[in-house]
Amino acid sequence: MATFLGNPVTFTGSQLQVGEIAHDFSLITPALEKKSLADFAGKKKVLSIIPSIDTGICSMQTRHFNKTLSDLEDTVVLTVSVDLPFAQGKWCAAEGLDNAIMLSDYYDHSFGKAYGLLINEWHLLARAVLVLDADNKITYVEYLDNINSEPNYDAAIEAVKVLG
């Protein structure tokens, strides 16, 4: 059972599994542009899903994946939260991560519902990492039972590297 701040939580929707094709989405960037999965066609994708960029672990996760994977060819890190796009942009500017791709699900939580990550009790996204190949097939997933803990960075990074 997943917990957030030590309390059990429930989710809307079903979590995706390895072998499935990732659902398309429409999310908002800090520049208020809509982005979908199709905008990253032909690239390997790391979906780094966090509750809020304004927390220590979420900031650490976002920095780690962006700094570690930014040099890999044909690979993008997509950080998804329900933070307002303005907050995401402000965080990136403060951290000097100008090339980080931040996507907000604040508007209708459609991403959280489709991916089974919307926490019913808080209307935040659960912490998760999904790796997609260039055809959007899910090759790695980590759903954290303790949403207040860090993901297994090494396993996710290795999952990207084995895609070539």
UniProtKB/Swiss-Prot annotation:
UniProt key word Disulfide bond: yes
Enzyme class: oxidoreductase
Enzyme Commission number: 1.11.1.24
Molecular-function GO terms, alphabetical: thioredoxin peroxidase activity
All copies of domain Thioredoxin, residue ranges: 16-162
Catalysed reactions, semicolon-separated: a hydroperoxide + [thioredoxin]-dithiol = an alcohol + [thioredoxin]-disulfide + H2O
Keywords, in A-Z order: Antioxidant, Disulfide bond, Oxidoreductase, Peroxidase, Redox-active center
Coiled coil: none
UniProt cross-references to CDD domains, sorted A to Z: PRX_Atyp2cys
Catalytic-site annotation from UniProt: C58 (cysteine sulfenic acid (-soh) intermediate)
Record-annotated disulphide pairs: C58-C92
Pfam families named among the record's database cross-references: Redoxin
Cross-referenced Gene3D superfamilies: Glutaredoxin (3.40.30.10)
Keyword Oxidoreductase set for record: yes
Complex formation: Homodimer.
Family named by the database record: Belongs to the peroxiredoxin family. Tpx subfamily.
Role summary: Thiol-specific peroxidase that catalyzes the reduction of hydrogen peroxide and organic hydroperoxides to water and alcohols, respectively. Plays a role in cell protection against oxidative stress by detoxifying peroxides.
Note: The active site is a conserved redox-active cysteine residue, the peroxidatic cysteine (C(P)), which makes the nucleophilic attack on the peroxide substrate. The peroxide oxidizes the C(P)-SH to cysteine sulfenic acid (C(P)-SOH), which then reacts with another cysteine residue, the resolving cysteine (C(R)), to form a disulfide bridge. The disulfide is subsequently reduced by an appropriate electron donor to complete the catalytic cycle. In this atypical 2-Cys peroxiredoxin, C(R) is present in the same subunit to form an intramolecular disulfide.
Name of the molecule in the record: Thiol peroxidase
Gene: tpx
